[in-house]
Amino acid sequence: MEGKRMGYKEQYNFWLEDSYFDEAVKKELQEIGGDEKEIEDRFYKDLAFGTGGLRGVIGAGTNRMNIYTVRKATQGLANYIKKQGGEAKGVAIAYDSRRKSPEFADEAALCLAANGIKAYVFESLRPTPELSFALRELGCISGIVITASHNPPEYNGYKCYWEDGAQVTAPKDKEIITEVNNVTDYHTVKTMDKTEAMNAGLYQVIGKEIDDKYMEELKKQIIHPEIIKEVAKDMKIVYSPFNGTGNLPVRRILREIGFENVYVVPEQEMPDPDFTTLD
């Protein structure tokens, strides 16, 4: 698969026949075997890794979000990190409530681990700002958030952050894009068993300790705490996390700084990958 990119039909057959790809992917591809337009759309190009990372429809194919395109992007990031001499610092990983987000986070972590780069993975979904805090708190070289932000439910994405806690900017963005695009052979993409990675100290679950430190840091950012003390007891707040990641952390920080009357929209309280209340 190295060298000039195959045509879409060759790519389709490669994914269908090569032992590298799992049976679930092959079954999905077999089901579209008679749909030439769908095959072309899934394979006519590689899912673009841009300045914001990856974003695309979930499914099998080179132009889709799946474990293989996530691994490929992560291999490119790992190659860049190693060239920068940052592999000892590790990478923090968070994910949202979308379909496949936990799986994609794990695949990214295990690719990093296979490259000798420690992954710090949140135990459950977390908001993007906490990822920015975590990677700085842990002294990581980079961070990854599995999210597609405002896109429809059938989408997911992969955002890359650097050691300052912000999304990658010039010139690093283009340098990382180059490394990702240089990964042309899926067989060169590394991965490893999760238990093996954990035993080797290359996969660490993070959670409450980071949450607590994040909350304390948020409290330091309050500009007028005296005003909050005056109004918090009587003020009523209506909040909606829109079925995403904000429910627990937002309610926690509001409670801890004194707001007692916080009402969450019940239909949009729990994580929902289908975002069924939103048009």
Stretch-by-stretch model annotation:
Residues 10-108, 197-234, 245:
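An N-terminal, well-structured beta->alpha segment
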Residues 82, 109, 113, 255:
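Gly/Ala-rich phosphate-binding loop of Rossmann-like dinucleotide-binding domains
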Residues 1-5:
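Short, Lys/Arg-enriched N-terminal segments with co-localized hydrophobic residues
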Residues 85, 137-138, 256:
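Alpha-helix termination/capping residues and helix-transition junctions
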Residues 38-43, 47, 156-279:
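Gly/Ser/Thr-enriched, mixed-charge loops and adjacent short helices
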Residues 21, 54-56, 61-63, 98, ...:
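Short, glycine-/Ser/Thr-/acidic-enriched flexible segments
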Residues 92, 97-155, 260-279:
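N-terminal small/polar loop signature for handling phosphorylated ligands or for N-terminal nucleophile
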